[in-house]
Each structure stands twice: as structure tokens, then as C-alpha cells.
């Protein structure tokens, strides 16, 4: 790949494109004209002149093109902060926005076309593999999917030119709607379409109207079934927190259209615009900052080949009319005082050859005080370490509210400087080398937390099996976990059972004992505080209901929701009706009657952990009893189905009932849910019967036994203790998740599977003080895992800097780690010739990179900037060599005083 590193290498036609800094621009470029190179150079050029990477947005049509663009950018910009730059297609941006801005539920999944087909195939009781393998059937499914998007856009009032799949509303569909409107005496308009869509099955009888033309009747049936399955698809995605690729666009458009607080971008470039559809272009318009934007469109009329995906050649015509902006670049610095910015700008202009007019300005005209800008020469490398440490201590002592960073060029320097600070008892935080969160030991701790929150987490179990040294490689660990899944087993079976499994245990009880299937309806989802307002149960033996069911309604002082999401809560009216008739039981009476009904039987529920634990806490409040003190074991039909049918899209009760054509209704009334769960339990038993023999054979296999024994020895004690305590609230004030991480660390350290983590306390403090801060989240491990674990999984060591939890006000950091951070005081360590630029550099590119590194280091300062260097160095043979201040400082040295 060709590498271009300065603006002079661009030809005359490219320079205006790269230098464009304001307005709307359209670049039409045939293949081979260096379009990708220009896109990359624009990134480097703009960033060197003050545009932050996180204010830039680089969009293209395909993921492949995005990867090529990013690779080219990386070839000309050697900068760790480049990770802040967004490069991707429009869908990628929308996905990133929706998830990072918490615009969708945390557990939302992005489904592809085949998964979308699978959802509809489930409703139609068809084989998804058969559909995918049949072009015509697959096309029909696509039309249903596209139609659901068309309805969404119609419902939300999108302009017609932004509709993604207007073609899915065919002429035949229009004929059908018109006929239904005639029969129902409705006006033919968009609202009529939406009305028919919402009630598609109710209008099927219209297709059987007397004297109706059979062709028109077929059109009506086709449309109404298409509408029905499209609505099923919409509802399924909503209930299961799923988005398809088109949803990413539609949701982002609606949010940006309505919410002015969404981040707008002052600098955008878009490649292959001829391939964008109207909705994508509309989203880009919404992303653009209104004040003085820089938007660069690049495309080629000769390569517009994606009309089947909604792209229109008219897009370029629109852009030709729009793109008439002037070329200029306005920036304003809101951080640095003028005396610092003068240094940065002179350095950028004279050392990095940046046009002064394109460099930032500031309104902060505070004058420099004596000692704010210093050059610190030391006699030797050894004394430089001491001098810099002493200066950091002085700044720490004299300015109790300020932060100080010593920025070094290598990890070795960071280590030596850290030792020098330790010798003078200066507390500091060192950020260099491998990130703490990337180490195997911390990953093992994270995996432990993940499986406590979700025992079906494949990757985390793999890490535990490898990290605890049960297997020598991740590959072997993955194979082992995959084998368990095929056998309807979980690694938890090996830790919670001696010679059995969850499935086998359930089946034995199902065949030989009575089971009480139960469900609760509650005032909310907080198992520690909410009340049970309905509790229902049925007793079964061998799947047959024995005796009478139990259905109790209970008084509460807490409010009952009228709606469950967008659906009316059927219990609301029923509850208040019983309240008015005086038919509600006191919590004490109802709970005691339930216990009497239960006796010593085994409990079973769907998602039983919720029902069991809210029951336990209600018993504690009202009867002073606990389920944990009783002999009743409990099983979960949801867990059983996840083990027995591991690849379903949903394990909600209603989905399972429909998927397996089971008798029962999921109505959000406990008694109905119990009846439905009984049907599901029978299915679980049927499926379990075919799994137990294989499980037993696996557990008894001579090659498996040693691994199971090793696994238990390495992890069982820790897991069982934490697993059993997930629903216990921590009363001592310490965060439950923090306590669990501590316990895991102590355990793994004692077992000898990890080395000591010197900086673990930083992680624990950060979690306690900066992350686990929502008072609405109960201090119980299960609740904190569900609420916080996704964010915790993205942490980096540099997140600690300037956080509330960090106690140190002095930092030692490499240049790369300092990117994106700011400090009151900055000391650049050993800015000598031979370091800046490095004496081992072999090209001008390397020298220029070192100049940029020095600029980055200096520009972290908000108040004081000190440049330190050693005037002599010692080689490995003991020879002394004179050194000078880096020549990069020649043009700005006049601003600095020199210490003596």
C-alpha cells in the first residue's frame, strides 16, 4: 500500500479536496483517482490542524470499503487516538449510536436476514432452512420484512422519498386496500392502511364477500396475510429486543429528528454516495452540525449499480445543487490559555508546517506566571529522574487541587520514573505497558462475573476452563463447552452435581415425585421490594394435574401498572374489581395458604429465579420465614428449554407455546401462566428423556472424568459460593459486585492459577465509586451484574485517570496513553535529541511522527508545561556522551525559562 505522509505529495486537483474545511463538497472520481487516499489524507490533514477525531465521521457504503478506508488512514496516521475516529457504513454508525447512547435495551440483538426469516418461519410453521434454500419463498419472506418497514415509516410520518421499500406496497396491495375500504366504507388513505394492518385477521372475512372477483379476493388474502406476518415480525422483534439492519436506520432517523441533544458532527465525509438510498442521505443530513459544517461527498456516476437496494442516481443531482460551500477551516480552542496555545500553534506552524490560519484560537487571555513554562536540564539521566520526581512532588504539594502528568516516550522510562517517585514517597498512578483489562488474570475475573450473570455465556466458560488450567488451550476449552451444549448440559452441571445433571435431576423428580408448578404476578420487577399480587399453583405427577389448582389475589399498598409495555395489564382491572368486592387476601393469609398447598413438594416455574426470590422476600417481610430454610427445591422450565433447545431465538413462555404448538395461554395472569407452564413441563420431560443416557455416558467416559475432577478442584468452591449468594443483599455497605470480584481474586490467587494483580484495588475502587452508583439498583450481585456488566466489559486502564476513585493527583504515562487526557501540569520527560526524534529513526516519516508525539505530549497541559532532558548519557560501556534539547523545541524555546 502506498504511504503518503505530507500534503506536498498530493496533486493539484487533490489539494483543494484535502484542504476543504467548511461547507458542502461533492467529489466525482473515476476509479484510480486516489479517492481512498484523499479520504485518508483528509483525516491526517484535518487532525493536524485541530479537528478532534471524535468530531469526525467517515461513512461509506459497505463494510469492506470501510475497512479499506480505515487501513489507509492507519497507514498515514500513526496515532493511538485514532480509535476515536468513526469509520464505517451508515448502519455501523447507527448501531454504535443506538447502543452507546442507550437508545435501545442493553440486551438488544442485531439480527441478519436469515434470522429475520427464521422468526417469520416460526410463525408460519415452516422450515427456515427450506425457506432460505428456496429463492421464491425467500423472496416472499423478504417482501414481508420490507412491508413491515414500510408500515413503520408510514406510521411515523416519514417523507415518501425516504421510504426504504415502497415497492413492497404493490399495485395489487393497493387494489386490495381499496376494496377493503369500499366494503368497510372507509376513506382510502394512509390511516386506512394502518388500520387494516393493525387488524389484518379481522378483515379476512372481506375476502369471502359475495360476488367478489376471485382474483381480487386472492389479492386481499395475500395482502392481509402479509400484513399479519409483518405485524408478527414487528411484535416479535419488539418483545425480544431485536433489530434488523433496516431498523437501525429507522430508529436513528426518528431519534435524531426529534432530539436536539443528539451529538452533531462538524466534519463528515461520505464515500460512494451514489449507492446511498434516500433514508441514509437523510440520516447524514441529521448528523451534520448546523453551524459551519464540513461535509465531503465522494462518488462516481459510472458506478451507480445499487438501485435494487434503494439507491437512486438522482442523489447525485441533489448533491450537485447542494454543494456550493467555500473552503475554509474555523476552530476555536476552549481549553488552553493563550500563552500555552501560542506554544502549541508556533510549534505546529514552524515545526509541523501547518498553516497558521487553520490553527485554533482561544478567548482565554490569561497571562503566564513565573514558572508556568520551564525547560529543566539535568546533568545526567539519573539526576533527571530525581529532578522530575522532585518537581512533581513540589507541584503536588503547592497545588492541592491540581493534577500533574509526567509524560514519557517509553514504558521503561515510566518504570524508572515510577521507582524514583516511590523513593520519595510520592503517590502516583502509572499508565503504561499492557492495559490491565487485557491481562489474562483480569479477563478470568470478568469471565467469573459473566457466568454468574448468565450461565450460558460460551466465551466466559471457555476463559474459565482455560484460565483455571483445566485445559491447556482455548480451542480445547471451546470444544468441551460445545460438547456440553450438544448434550443439553451446562458447565454448572459439573459444579452443582456429583454424578448427575440438571436435566437428569428434573426428569427423575418428574417421573417419581409431585411437582408444584407456580407463578406470581407482582407490582414490579424488584424481587427485594415489590409485592406479590397474585400467586397461582398446580400440582402435577408425571405431567398429570392432581388435586385442585390454587389462585390467590393479595392486597398491596404499592401501585399496579396499567400497562405492561404497550399492552394493557389484564390484572389491573381484575385486581381492582376484587379489591372493590373485598375478595383480596392479606399477604400473611395468602402466603401461608400457598405454603400449606406446597408442603414439601418441588417447585417449578418459568424463569423461576424471579418468582422464587420475590416469594422468599415476601415471606420474610410478612411471615418472618424464608424459602431457603424450607426443603423445597426448585426447577426452571426456561433453563430447561435453553439446555434442551439451545438455538431458539426466544425462550419466553408465549414464544415456546407457539413454537411447539403447546396447549395454554400466556395472558399475564398467574393461573393462566401456570397452566401454560404445565404444558411446557411435559415437553421438557419428553425432550429430557432423550438426553439423559447420553449425558450419563459422557460423565462416565474415562477421558472426561479427569477433566471434570480438575474443573471441580479448580473452580467448584468459588462458583457454588457465589452462585448461591447471587440474590443475597449485601448489608455491610460494600458493593456486591466488588465483593464478588475480591472473593474471586483471593480464590484464584490461592489456587495458583493467577499471579498477584498489583493494581486490582484501582479496579475495585473505580467500580465502587464511578460505576456502581445507581441507587435504584439493589445491592445484590444478580441485580448489579444485569445492570452494569456490559459497561464493565469495555473498561480500559486509562478510564481511571481523573476519575472520582483515583486518589493520586500525579500520573506517569506514555505519550500514547496520554492521548485524549488533560492535566493541569505536564512534565515532558527526557525531551532530548536522540529521543525526539529518536536516533534510531530511519526515515523522515519517523521523525515527523516523533514531532507529533512531542506536540501531543505538550498539548495535554492546561496550565503549566515543563520540558525536561538530561545533558549527558552513559552508554553500556560506561562512556559519557553530551546531549542537547530536542531540535523540535528550537522554534518555541523563547517562550520558556530555564531552571538552574
Ranges and model annotations:
Residues 683, 801-809, 832-900:
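C-terminal accessory regions
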Residues 26-39, 43, 324-326, 333-426, ...:
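Helicase P-loop NTPase motor core
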Residues 55-175, 317, 633, 655-658:
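Conserved P-loop NTPase-based nucleic-acid remodeling module centered on helicase motor cores
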Residues 1-107, 264, 345, 818, ...:
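P-loop NTPase Walker
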Residues 513-516, 523-623, 628, 650, ...:
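Conserved non-catalytic scaffold segment of RNase H-like nuclease domains
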Residues 223-226, 454-516, 524, 539-540, ...:
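Accessory C-terminal helicase-associated subdomains
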Residues 2, 45, 278-370, 375, ...:
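Conserved RecA-like helicase ATPase core segment
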Residues 3-19, 23-31, 116, 211, ...:
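Conserved helicase NTPase motor core
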